[in-house]
Amino acid sequence: MGALDDLRVLDLTQVLAGPYCTMLLADMGADVVKVERPGGDLIRSNPPFVSDGDEEAYGGYFQSVNRGKRSLELDLGTDEDREAFLSLVERADVVVENFKAGTMEKFDCGYETLREHNPDLIYSSIRGFGDPRTGETHRQGQPSFDLIAQALGGVMEITGQSDGPPTKVGPGVGDLFTAVLNAVGILAAVHHRERTGEGQYVDTAMYDSMVSLCERTVYQYSCDGESPTRQGNSHPTLFPYDSFEAADGHVVIAAFADGHWETLCEAMERPDLAADYPDAGSRIANRESLRREIADWTATIDSETLLDLLEGRVPAAPVQNTADIFDDPHIHDREMLTDVDQPGADEQITIAGSPIKMTETMPSPGGRAPLLDEHRAELLDEAGVGTGTNRVESDD
């Protein structure tokens, strides 16, 4: 039993932001129906593959963010499929899409039309620049992807080394953070509907989300009138809070609190530093020289020895790669790696598990991602429009 096992979601999204949002809901038990355009989600054929892309139904990208969903292929441009979709809407709690503003209206399936079929429907969109219903801007006709959102929202300007160019954050935070916020908005709307009976429109823009993610830069600029820029792995108001090279790799140390600083100086056998720089202000004012002192120390010690010296008393960690993560007992104890079947392959694929843990209704990936149109017969039967015939045969 999942916390959301009474929630029916129609997911018209594709690529990353929308599918990740509905994946979070599916992991918590929601019945997520992936309504796919003819030919399916654009990323079904994206690599990597376990062995042979010609044999496998989809790649790891699609598998990772579409696990636990059901699939129905519909062409909303045809009367038959549009009517089938509207029948599904009548039985749904939530509709999610991530098309450019106005796309659903072209099929006469916009929010206002769907509300006529289901007055308490929660309709949610993820767009680069939001929907005119919640605030019209000149950008809303423009396309957007993660890279665009990171560039506009200030993420790239504050990421990278101080003497280097603006740099994209590795994970697609323009998509992923927006997706998480949109899921929060959907659940808030569900709660509101339970109290009032009112459905509503939930709108989350990628650009807006990146500004929210960079909240620190907003108040900094408001206070001093200077645009924050790149500082490598350091922090503008905390020290030491940085990465350092050890004898066998890199570590990060976050010893900005006075007690942590004293413990770090003790491990370095430098009580003079603790005495000379006892407070945050003095450490920040002398951060460059102090960073050199710490870097000279870490360079002579391997990561494991360094962390043993700090004995869990100072926040510190090695910089791990993905192979290290796969070997970390913590990750296995927390069930953060999940093996699922990969249709067309002889072995399973590992995907990231759910980071949301609950004592009574533990979220969990609900099995592999669906084949295109795999659940057509059962979904059309549930919608009361006939069983239909699967356009793509299931491998089950």
UniProtKB/Swiss-Prot annotation:
Active site: 175 (nucleophile)
SUPFAM superfamilies associated with the record: CoA-transferase family III (CaiB/BaiF)
Disulfide bonds: none
Enzyme Commission code: 2.8.3.26
Quaternary data: Homodimer.
Function: Involved in the methylaspartate cycle. Catalyzes the transfer of the CoA moiety from succinyl-CoA to mesaconate to generate mesaconyl-CoA (2-methylfumaryl-CoA) and succinate. Also shows high activity with methylsuccinate as CoA-acceptor, and only low activity with glutarate, acrylate and itaconate. Cannot use other CoA donors like acetyl-CoA, propionyl-CoA, butyryl-CoA or acetoacetyl-CoA.
Name the record gives this protein: Succinyl-CoA:mesaconate CoA-transferase
Organism name: Haloarcula hispanica (strain ATCC 33960 / DSM 4426 / JCM 8911 / NBRC 102182 / NCIMB 2187 / VKM B-1755)
Gene assigned in the entry: mct
